[in-house]
From Swiss-Prot:
HAMAP family: Salvage_MtnB. PANTHER family: METHYLTHIORIBULOSE-1-PHOSPHATE DEHYDRATASE. One of its GO terms (cellular component) is cytoplasm. GO terms for biological process: L-methionine salvage from methylthioadenosine; monosaccharide metabolic process. Zn(2+) binds at residues 106, 108. This is Methylthioribulose-1-phosphate dehydratase. Catalyzes the dehydration of methylthioribulose-1-phosphate (MTRu-1-P) into 2,3-diketo-5-methylthiopentyl-1-phosphate (DK-MTP-1-P). The lineage of its organism: Bacteria, Pseudomonadati, Pseudomonadota, Gammaproteobacteria, Lysobacterales.
Length: 225
């Protein structure tokens, strides 16, 4: 470092560590087909003021350490003048609001995207009675329901972030869908965020399969004699 180079406002060693954690997990999600055509974005809390996040437009199955950048919680690049995802604010709003959240994952699997289109008019997908509901942190029984919000897609991230914040004021959430887009899920660490993401994927797929099996028929309870 020369005399004119300012020190980084974050730990380079910690960034190096998190970059490898992110890349390994993102590669697995890419190989599963959840990040097509350079889509999706992923982040991890770096410290109390910064997050490590994927650089915009990079192939998620071929990431290298240089494809992980740093942003502050206003979504601005720190350190290197790279372009973060346009959806960075949807990550950083969670880090600002919840100090315990340390990882945010956003994917575009076919299941997530189709579900977001089918249920857009309902504004929510209600998941009820599944054993796998216990995968969500704090749930201890299948005898409960989890509502997955479906937000309208918009290019204005300030508007979408405000809508997410308004709903977070009213209820606990582990994730949400954006119409015609994909799924956001988060957790206190990468393992928990992955668990939530995978649980949503499985449960949404179950709901889509049930719709196909039921067709347009309405299930009418049989009266007991």
């Amino acid at each position: 470092m020369n005399a004119t180079t300012a020190p980084l406002p974050y730990s380079a060693a910690r960034l190096h560590e998190l970059a490898h954690v992110l890349i390994a997990n993102i590669r697995e999600l890419a190989h599963a087909g959840w990040t097509p055509a350079t889509s999706s974005n992923f982040s991890h809390r770096l410290d109390e003021q910064h997050a490590a996040i994927t650089v915009s437009g990079r192939d998620k199955g071929r990431l290298v350490e240089e494809d992980i950048m740093v942003v502050d919680f206003d979504g601005l690049a720190v350190g290197r003048p790279l372009r973060p995802s346009a959806e960075t604010l949807l990550h950083t709003q969670l880090y600002r609001r919840f100090p315990e959240i340390c990882c945010v994952l956003h994917t575009h699997s076919p299941v997530q995207t189709i579900a977001s289109r089918l249920y857009a008019g309902s504004d929510v997908i209600r998941l009820e009675g599944y054993e796998l509901l216990k995968a969500f942190e704090g749930n201890t029984t299948h005898e409960t329901a989890v509502e997955v919000p479906v937000f309208a897609n918009t290019q204005d991230m300030q508007v979408l972030a405000a809508q997410v914040d308004a709903l977070l004021d009213k209820q606990s959430m582990w994730g949400y869908l954006i119409e015609g887009h994909g799924l956001y899920a988060w957790g206190r660490n990468m393992a928990e965020a992955r668990r939530h993401l995978e649980a949503f994927e499985f449960l949404l797929q179950c709901e889509l399969e049930l719709l196909k099996l039921r067709g347009t028929r309405q299930v009418v309870p049989v009266p007991h004699s």
